[in-house]
């Protein structure tokens, strides 16, 4: 038995009333929607209003994305040949510190436009789409948000402390409550005789009101896995990780002289390789770089990583 059920026919009068009702609502909605409904968000406000647009989510993935953005800025510095060490430390108070021995974010006054007179470092940390990767000769290669990224981290943090060693001097600046400067960038002394001569240190404490769903506690394993991959992909770069949180203290350093050759060996370490030597090829042409490593094993599944 097949039975078809149709809705009762609509009375013509009822149909006209419905159309008139919809038309009236549409006209009213159009009349209510005007220039006053258009919002213009300045500074870092857009990031705090819609953080998911910038870091993907406000869960644990988004929380760890803050670390990736700060670290990726330094990786670009390393790829440009100006840095060979990155340090990432999870501090006891829940904050994260990322330090490097790169050139140090510029500290001189910004030369033009609405930000004229502010230090370049303040502009980089408080203005979206500000950085050295969008043009000029500062960087040949870059990835991630960068420039945007560090300012996004500032916007989504309860507190940020910036320290720069450059030109023999140590500069510092602090931000609070979503990137509001506590004071101007200032010299606090000479660069210490021991240790790095130039570089940048960014220490940030994620804002718990932004990451309310899953909290602001970093997962060491998540950080370590990402850092190891970065070390494989950036041959010779030293990436030092430390966890100073009580009961979870550890220190791990990644550095791979063989780059992606070591990466392939690592991926194949639990498999039976058909050849002991990893095939490797690299070349550069017109600014484009190619780096390939291959090793066959007895398995049936291919693994392509890039």
Region locations from a protein language model:
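A conserved short beta-strand within the histidine kinase catalytic ATPase domain
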Residues: 84-90
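Bergerat-fold GHKL ATPase/HATPase_c domain
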Residues: 16-68, 123
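GHKL/Bergerat-fold ATPase module in large chromosome/replication-associated machines
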Residues: 241-306
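Flexible hinge/switch segments at interdomain interfaces of large molecular machines
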Residues: 40-48, 91-92, 99, 192-203, ...
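GHKL-type ATPase core
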Residues: 16-37, 94-120, 131-266
């Amino acid at each position: 038995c097949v039975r078809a059920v149709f809705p009762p026919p609509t009375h013509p009068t009822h149909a006209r009333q419905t159309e008139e009702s919809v038309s009236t609502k549409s006209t009213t909605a159009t009349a209510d929607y005007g220039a006053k409904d258009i919002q213009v968000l300045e500074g870092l406000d857009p990031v705090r209003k819609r953080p998911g647009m910038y870091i993907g989510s406000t869960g644990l993935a988004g929380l760890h994305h803050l670390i990736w953005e700060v670290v990726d800025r330094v990786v670009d510095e390393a790829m440009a040949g100006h840095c060979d060490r990155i340090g990432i430390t999870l501090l006891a108070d829940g904050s994260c510190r990322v330090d490097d021995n790169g050139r140090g974010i510029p500290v001189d006054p910004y030369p033009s436009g609405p930000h004229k007179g502010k230090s370049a470092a303040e502009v980089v940390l408080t203005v979206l789409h500000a950085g050295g990767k969008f043009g000029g000769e500062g960087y040949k290669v870059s990835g991630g948000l960068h420039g945007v990224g560090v300012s996004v981290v500032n916007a989504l943090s309860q507190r940020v402390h910036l320290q720069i060693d450059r030109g023999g001097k140590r500069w510092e600046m602090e931000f609070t409550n979503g990137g509001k400067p506590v004071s101007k960038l200032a010299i606090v002394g000479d660069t210490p005789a021991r240790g790095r001569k130039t570089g940048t240190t960014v220490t940030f404490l994620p804002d718990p009101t932004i990451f309310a769903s899953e909290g602001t506690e970093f997962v060491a394993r998540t950080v370590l896995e990402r850092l190891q991959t970065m070390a494989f992909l950036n041959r010779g770069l030293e990436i030092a990780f430390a966890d100073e949180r009580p009961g979870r203290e550890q220190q791990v350093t990644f550095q791979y002289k063989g780059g992606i050759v070591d990466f392939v060996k690592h991926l194949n370490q639990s498999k039976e390789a058909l050849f002991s030597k990893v095939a490797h090829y690299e070349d550069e042409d017109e600014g484009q770089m190619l780096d390939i490593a291959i090793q066959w094993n007895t398995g049936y599944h291919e693994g392509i990583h890039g």
